[in-house]
Amino acid sequence: MLYYLSAERPKALQYIESKLEMEKYRSRKLKLRDVLEITPESLKNCPPQTTGDLPWHFLRKLMALNGMARSTSLEHRAPTDQTLTMDKEELDIPEDFSFLSDTDTSDSLHPLDVLCAILLSSDSFLQQEILSKMSMCQFALPLLLPALDTPKCTLLLWAMRDMVRKWRPHSLAESRGFREESLVLTSMPTISFVRMGSCSFSKSHLLNEVLSPSQQHHNFFVHWDMESGNVPRAIADGLVEISWYFPGGMGN
């Protein structure tokens, strides 16, 4: 069951937190040291098998700058040897036939729902680290979180305060100079993309095509055709994301 109406958003958040097994972080925020702590679980490199695995899968992959961090597909466990033996006998399956585990999105969650829930459950320092690592992975960053547990949207500007970028404007192309400034303090042109109503194409996919260098497609924004991108959203509607394009001084 998914919730979409504004009046139901707190219930929707509780639903997602329950699916992700993050209810305990409503009162005690998730901290950076929780993510960096080395435990037997953190040393395992297993694909997520339940929705409760998704937050830790995202955070650990992100800290390792893994481009697959946003995937929320769940892997089905292969049956145990005892179950296999029984099933093969009952179904008259040849002994050399093997069952393979597979991934599935039917029971999964939208990647942006997972991201919103994690950010709302994190303290300010972990939020800062999450956005910093997302920027390094060239993911679009969440700028405004929907009003879920607060009356107003949450602006994540503080979490971006340490981000510094270097670029070469056309005015410095001949001298091969560059500018290096904080993203938060730099004044730059802004273009907004808003989808009005229902469209037959993905706005995010179109933006990825525009922002990607020629012959180097990159998924800055999550879109329908990505793995788990077609899962219905429960809490991420209204999320405002931001990405930057920095000129390199080239003519194209």
Predicted region positions:
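Switch I (effector-binding) loop of TRAFAC-class P-loop GTPase G-domains
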Residues: L211-N252
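Conserved beta-strand elements of beta-rich interaction domains across eukaryotes
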Residues: T150, M196-C199, G249-G251
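Beta-strand-rich binding-surface signature
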Residues: L115, A140, M188-F193, S204, ...
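Extended amphipathic alpha-helical scaffold segments
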Residues: F178-D225
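N-terminal low-complexity/disordered regulatory or targeting extensions
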Residues: M1-S182, T186-T190, D225
